[in-house]
Design a protein with these regions (language model features):
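Bacterial Sec-dependent N-terminal signal peptides
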Residues: 1-21
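Blade-loop segments of beta-propeller domains
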Residues: 26-28, 66-109, 129-146, 198-213, ...
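Structural signature of eukaryotic scaffold interfaces centered on beta-propeller domains
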Residues: 28-42, 87-96, 142-161, 212-221, ...
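Beta-propeller blade signature
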Residues: 61-63, 112-122, 178-193, 238-253, ...
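Short, conserved, GDST-rich strand-edge loop motifs in beta-rich repeat architectures
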Residues: 161-181, 228-240, 285-297, 354-372, ...
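Long, internal scaffold/assembly segments composed of regular secondary structure
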Residues: 215-228, 234-370
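Conserved blade-ending motifs and adjacent loop-strand segments that build the rim/top face
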Residues: 257-271, 314-333, 387-433, 470-472, ...
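Loop/turn-rich, solvent-exposed surfaces of beta-rich toroidal or solenoidal domains
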Residues: 285, 338-341, 348-359, 367-377, ...
């Protein structure tokens, strides 16, 4: 039943380095919503489709890639019929089971639910309400490019199944409010038991409002939280907004804080926290600081046990800029936005970047802002944050809305908000890219607009990929200093194309298996398959 074929358009490559594709059974193109694949430890592949029409659909494929379950999840607490007031905060495998964290507005109050599914049948095993925030109908507190967060977040430990939930209340503080009970973090075991909870506040009240950056979990031992602390009114002796790195320990109901003084006055900060051994890294990105000779990126290293700052390094990428100048005809430095950080056990890392530019188009208030997702820059950094190797790939896509930094990091755990009522504008799942490193070779994957198919190669003005119907999946292979383009599903033609849902994809580094949803077009006909790509 599955179809097997390899990459066809290859010159003299080592056969072991050729990605091999397995296709599951055909099915109809998914409707508007959100899709996610999970390759479970038991060998099954779970395909979740959040449908605006049918609710949450779950399909399960066995190790032979045959469909063995097709069912609908019937939740009691979460209202599947009201998808437009729902956001996905994370989808993880925990304790061998698919676990889905959803947030939904209930009479304007954000409520978080946890759904646990059976790994064999897809049935709903348990559903719990984890928390609730006050109404979203309030004035935002926005000072010097820092917004008081009013939202909930979930992060899972990458090395275990412990996880944490953060609940941020960001409404203007009233006289009757307890300022020490506005932000709470819940620490859970793999069995979904609450093992600790902590209130997040500054004991000396030097900051009243907080903007969430990121969170990380280290087993049952620690929860780390990055925020920006700021005040609505300037207090005497107030140094302005600063980044805080905070730590919750099992023997405490409150956080210990490390204030990063060098971040005084920073605004609109993006970041990512990851744990490796005895160290914790927090990468910060401040777009306003991205100027000539300065990337706006700072790598901070903390002691995992104490949460104290060990060192702080400003990252720079001269080799990547040289690569861009030599191969993509750049005249100046590459100014990429960080999209995802892969931290290795030894402290070295891989940073995935993408060039962003923003523009306004049209009269609609909802869909006026757009983001160009441009060239790909990837740099492999040593333990000190210096470049070891770089990759540069030309790409041009456009998306409705403003794309934020670390979007690929969030997409990897399926963070998604169902806000766009126009299905044609929901192109996020097709855009940006993926990076697959294996020993001796690496691959960059994305959907491209191959306009030479339309023009016979005459079109000299590059057009961006804007609509899913124009997408064609390409795989760039980097080997021995050379770059080659592969078409894994066959050569695209004017009337024939192959596109993959990047947002639905799941990569298992142990098995080197990449699972995604493939949409094949032949004339006016379309069909979908789960595609497993072995790298």
């Amino acid at each position: 039943w599955p179809v097997l074929f390899g990459a066809l358009l290859i010159s003299s490559l080592v056969i072991a380095q050729v990605p091999v594709v397995t296709l599951g059974p055909d099915f109809s193109e998914p409707g508007d919503g959100w899709d996610k694949l999970m390759q479970l430890k038991n060998g099954n592949t779970v395909y979740l489709h959040f449908s605006k029409k049918d609710g949450l659909l779950v399909n399960i494929y066995d190790t032979a890639r045959a469909l063995k379950v097709a069912d609908t999840v019937h939740a009691q607490l979460w209202n599947a019929a009201d998808l437009e007031s729902t956001e996905i905060d994370g989808i993880f495998e925990i304790n061998g089971q698919p676990v889905i964290f959803l947030q939904q507005l209930v009479k304007y109050n954000p409520v978080m639910y946890r759904l646990v599914l059976d790994a064999e049948t897809g049935r709903l095993l348990r559903e719990d309400k984890l928390g609730e925030l006050p109404s979203v109908q309030h004035r935002s507190v926005f000072i010097d490019d820092n917004l008081a967060t009013h939202d909930m977040y979930v992060e899972k430990d990458t090395n275990s199944d412990y996880y944490a939930v953060a609940l941020f209340s960001g409404a203007p503080i009233q006289k009757t409010d307890s300022v020490r009970e506005r932000i709470r973090v819940l620490h859970f075991s793999p069995a979904h038991e609450l093992i600790n909870s902590g209130w997040f506040y500054i004991p000396d009240s030097s900051y009243s409002y907080f903007s969430y950056i990121n969170m990380a979990v280290k087993g049952k031992e620690k929860v780390y939280l990055g925020t920006v602390g700021f005040n609505a009114k300037r207090k005497e002796g107030d140094a302005g907004a600063k980044v805080l790195f905070s730590m919750l320990s099992p023997d405490s109901a409150t956080f210990a804080h490390e204030v990063l003084d060098y971040t005084a006055g920073f605004g609109n900060i993006g970041g990512n926290i990851q744990v490796t051994g005895a160290q914790v890294r927090m990468l910060l990105y401040v777009s306003s600081k991205q100027k000539e000779g300065y990337t706006g990126m700072m790598m901070n290293t903390f002691q995992a046990a104490t949460g104290k700052l060990k060192k702080q390094v400003q990252l720079s990428f001269p080799e990547l800029s040289r690569n861009m100048q030599q191969n993509l005809n750049y005249k100046e430095e590459y100014k990429g936005t960080p999209q995802r950080l892969h931290l290795n056990e030894d402290g070295s890392s891989t940073l995935l970047m993408e060039s962003f530019s923003f523009f306004k188009q049209g009269n609609s208030q909802l869909n006026k802002l757009h983001t160009n997702l441009g060239d790909i820059g990837i740099t492999l950094l040593d333990t000190a944050g210096r470049e070891n190797a770089t990759l540069a790939v030309s790409k041009y896509q456009v998306i409705t809305g403003v794309c934020e930094p670390f979007q690929l990091q969030r997409r990897s755990k399926s963070e998604w908000v169902f806000r766009n009522k126009i299905a044609a504008l929901n192109t996020n799942t097709w855009l940006s890219y993926d990076y697959i490193p294996v020993p001796g070779v690496s691959f960059v994957l994305f959907n491209d607009y191959l306009q030479y198919l339309d023009t016979g190669g005459q079109d000299k003005v590059r057009k961006p990929l804007k609509f899913a119907a124009d997408a064609n999946f390409v795989c760039y292979r980097f080997y021995n200093g050379k770059m080659e383009r592969l078409f894994l599903f066959g050569m695209p033609e004017v009337t024939k194309g192959y596109a993959c849902m990047m947002g639905a994809a799941d990569y298992n580094a142990q098995t080197r298996m990449y699972a995604t949803v493939l949409i094949s077009r032949k004339g006016q006909e379309k069909k979908a398959n789960i595609a497993w790509i072995k790298f």
